[in-house]
UniProtKB/Swiss-Prot annotation:
E.C. code: 6.1.1.23
Native source organism of the sequence: Sinorhizobium medicae (strain WSM419)
Region (Aspartate): 199-202
Keywords: Aminoacyl-tRNA synthetase, ATP-binding, Cytoplasm, Ligase, Nucleotide-binding, Protein biosynthesis
Keyword Ligase in annotation: yes
Protein name (record): Aspartate--tRNA(Asp/Asn) ligase
Keyword Plastid: no
Cleavable signal peptide: none
């Protein structure tokens, strides 16, 4: 028999009754029932109940073991009685009667429990992550993550993609976030950067004559953490294709990701045909370029109903500024003053002056609008708004006014708030969509200049003619995102493979041809030697896993994450370097000034 085990703790079944077996694992818990000890023995695969009665030669050792000790147990497999069968365990029809117990490793008193879902401080959980990972939910999440990545690899291979790996030490490149820099010992004063994404390398692969590349790529960005973004590193399913238009990328990736969701959704419905929503339409309907389509609320413009109306706040805004619009947020079943007042109070808590509203109720046989706005604009305008929005008895509507560019984010948050408060969001489904036609440029208010809105390597719609126009902010890019339940899970574009277009695109944001050659020299040179039309995208693996397992944040699906301050409490990183190491790298720390 093997030194440690003949079976795993998930393997034994009724067919094994009468067998002598050996198991090894962690003591999950010990229970004393009338002098008989019951030990739940756990390993990576599952759990088996071990029994030690006072007549057993293993009983003395069984009395000493404690939770999370690692032990080896030899014994006989016996069937449980009908009344003691545990239908919730694969091994629940049998138990192991111990004949010998060997303690392989004792455990100190635990700083946190490893069963159940303890509400322990995150820093304690991360410092003792090796214990935290023993919890069933977290353990299952990590296993499921591995299964999802394996399924991605398999499905990408099935549709003709080949996995290639690209360098981890590379040059610094402005991708929209800070780089992690790595000093060069051989070239003092110079630095490598960890890649924010394999963007340039995968495009160079297409220029080199490869096609249908993919990679499970580690990416590194020195960003502030949040619930849907880990500090430091993350992983993406990266891909690129040659001789394609954006529809070709969509047609290849939509069935693949739908199949991944269907495989791991646990029976929840998944969108069959992903709608393609232009960016501008998404902003106006949902107040976001990553809308949660499980929420049925769609905003509409109702400016005309307030122009020249008795509600002077809106009417005067419209009259004095042609950019002003009034957006309506319909809220079916929200037609109570209490709910409307809660929404108004919430808006004020967000720094807004309030949230105007109308709600409708029947007065006898007549449907009437109620609330201050209804009284000010009159019955005819109130009814016109209700008709436009398709509302009825017991429904409400909220209004946001101003220049859309300044208020659309708040309007989107109000839409989300109303949908959640009214339980309109179906949380038992996955709603996916494409967001397309992103703006190529945007206005940088801080620096008072035009800047790239998203990926600077995207192909602008309209080509050189558009880039030479006076209205740069109207240019759209062949850029697209995939969104699921309010989270961006992928982003991509058709690339700009023309050196002339590349230079012009960067000139419009204040960078010269020399700047382009210095910052993107490899890509710029490559495009001068026969570059095919190409495009691709990248899926955020961490976010996809988080959605599929129902985790609240990314730390619940990552093995050894950092905390919110970008610290690895388990390994003690970041940490000071030894003086000798710094001298070797020609680096001298500069003392930080105290505030």
């Amino acid at each position: 028999m093997h030194r440690y085990r003949s079976h795993t703790c998930a393997a034994l079944r009724k067919s094994d009754v009468g067998s002598t077996v050996r198991l090894s694992g962690w003591v999950h818990r010990v229970r004393d029932h009338g002098g008989v000890l019951f030990i739940d023995l756990r390993d990576h695969y599952g759990m088996t109940q071990v029994v030690a009665d006072p007549d057993s030669p293993a009983f003395k050792a069984a009395e000493t073991v404690r939770g999370e000790w690692v032990i080896r147990v030899d014994g006989a497999v016996k069937a449980r009685t009908d009344e003691t069968v545990n239908r919730n365990m694969p091994t629940g029809e049998v138990e192991l009667y111990a004949r010998e117990i060997e303690v392989l490793s004792a455990a100190k008193e635990l700083p946190l429990p490893v069963f159940g879902e303890p509400d322990y401080p995150e820093d304690v959980r991360l410092k003792y992550r090796f214990l935290d990972l023993r919890r069933e939910t977290l353990h299952k999440n990590i296993v499921r993550r591995t299964e999802i990545i394996a399924a991605m690899r398999r499905r990408m291979s099935d549709i003709g993609f080949t996995e290639y790996t690209t360098p981890i030490l590379t040059a610094s490149s402005p991708e929209g976030a800070r780089d992690f820099l790595v000093p060069s010992r051989i070239h003092p004063g110079n630095f490598y950067a960890l890649p924010q994404a394999p963007q340039q390398y995968k495009q160079l692969l297409m220029v080199a004559g490869f096609d249908r590349y993919f990679q499970i790529a580690p990416c590194f960005r020195d960003e502030d953490p949040r619930a849907d973004r880990l500090p430091g590193e993350f992983y993406q399913l990266d891909l690129e294709m040659s001789f394609v238009e954006q529809e070709d990328v969509w047609d290849a990736m939509e069935p693949m990701i739908r199949a991944i969701f269907a495989d791991f959704a646990g029976g929840k419905p998944v969108t069959d045909k992903f709608p393609r929503i232009p960016y501008d339409a998404a902003i106006r309907k949902y107040g976001s370029d990553k809308p949660d389509l499980r929420n049925p609320i769609e905003m509409q413009e109702v400016t005309e109903h307030f122009a020249g109306s008795g509600f002077k706040v809106f009417a005067n805004m419209i009259a004095s500024n042609p950019k002003v619009e009034i957006w309506a947020i319909p809220a079916k079943t929200g037609g109570s003053r209490a709910f409307c007042d809660r929404m108004n109070a919430w808006a004020q808590s967000q720094g807004q002056p309030g949230l105007g509203y109308i709600f409708w109720r029947k007065e006898g046989e007549k449907l009437e609008g109620a609330g201050p706005l209804a009284k000010n604009i009159g019955e005819e305008r109130t009814d016109a708004i209700r008709t436009q929005l398709g509302l009825g008895d017991g429904d409400a509507c909220f209004f946001v006014a101003g220049e859309p560019a300044k208020f659309y984010k708040f309007a989107g948050e109000a839409r989300t708030r109303a949908g959640e408060e009214l339980n309109l969001v179906d949380r038992e489904r996955y709603e996916l969509c494409w967001i397309v036609d992103f703006p190529f440029y945007e206005w940088n208010e801080e620096e008072k200049r035009v800047d790239f809105a998203h990926n600077p390597f995207s192909m602008p719609q309209g080509g050189l003619t558009a880039l030479s126009s006076d209205d740069l902010l109207s240019i759209k890019a062949f850029q697209y995102d995939m969104v699921c339940n309010g989270f961006e899970i992928a982003s991509g574009s058709i690339r700009n493979q023309s050196p002339e277009l590349m230079v012009k695109a960067f000139e419009n944001v204040g960078l010269s041809q020399a700047d382009v050659e210095e910052r993107f020299g490899g890509l710029y040179r490559a495009f001068q030697y026969g570059a095919p039309p190409h495009g691709g995208m990248a899926f955020g693996i961490d976010r996809i896993v988080m959605l599929l397992v129902g985790a609240k944040n990314l730390r619940e699906i990552s093995l050894f994450p950092m905390n919110q301050q970008a610290q690895d409490l388990l390994m003690g990183a970041p940490s000071p370097a030894e003086p000798a190491q710094l001298r070797e790298l020609a680096i001298r720390p500069v003392p930080q000034k105290k505030d």
